[in-house]
């Protein structure tokens, strides 16, 4: 703001909007995992994860661990994750943002997974 000749501070409504832009209404969100194709089915397809600090890479690591894809000394097999069977989010995307934008009517983030690329 110091470089602006006309605007010395933000208007009140802009300041209050920015305060709430990065806050999440719930501390934990529900993630439902659904397999695509021949991917193995999870025993517990629903998990809770922190909404504010966790990135999507945490969801990928959790699913790899549950599916036992991480092997000693190697990368292991691939797993491909999609939100709402539409797109693969970036690994640095905050899970709370994905939940806020793409949750279903049951307030769950649907993450589908496959062992081979499923879309595009």
UniProtKB/Swiss-Prot annotation:
- Note the InterPro entries from the entry: Atg12, Ubiquitin-like_domsf
Keywords (alphabetical) are: Autophagy, Isopeptide bond, Membrane, Protein transport, Transport, Ubl conjugation pathway
Q: Does the keyword DNA-binding apply?
A: no
One cellular component GO annotation, for this chain's record? Atg12-Atg5-Atg16 complex
The membrane topology term of the UniProt record is: Peripheral membrane protein
Q: Which SUPFAM superfamilies match?
A: Ubiquitin-like (SSF54236)
Q: Per its UniProt record, what Pfam families does this chain match?
A: APG12 (PF04110)
Which Gene Ontology molecular function entries are recorded, alphabetically? protein tag activity
Does the UniProt entry include the keyword Protein biosynthesis? no
A single Gene Ontology biological process assigned to it is: protein transport
Q: Where in the cell is it found?
A: Preautophagosomal structure membrane
Cross-link Glycyl lysine isopeptide (Gly-Lys) (interchain with K-97 in ATG5): give the residues. Answer: 120
Task: Enumerate the PANTHER family for this protein.
Answer: AUTOPHAGY PROTEIN 12 (PTHR13385), UBIQUITIN-LIKE PROTEIN ATG12 (PTHR13385:SF0)
Record family assignment: Belongs to the ATG12 family.
What is its biological role?
A: Ubiquitin-like protein involved in cytoplasm to vacuole transport (Cvt), autophagy vesicles formation, mitophagy, and nucleophagy. Conjugation with atg5 through a ubiquitin-like conjugating system involving also atg7 as an E1-like activating enzyme and atg10 as an E2-like conjugating enzyme, is essential for its function. The atg12-atg5 conjugate functions as an E3-like enzyme which is required for lipidation of atg8 and atg8 association to the vesicle membranes.
Subunit info here reads: Forms a conjugate with atg5.
State the name under which the record lists this protein: Ubiquitin-like protein ATG12
- Organism of derivation: Sclerotinia sclerotiorum (strain ATCC 18683 / 1980 / Ss-1) (White mold)
Gene name? Answer: atg12
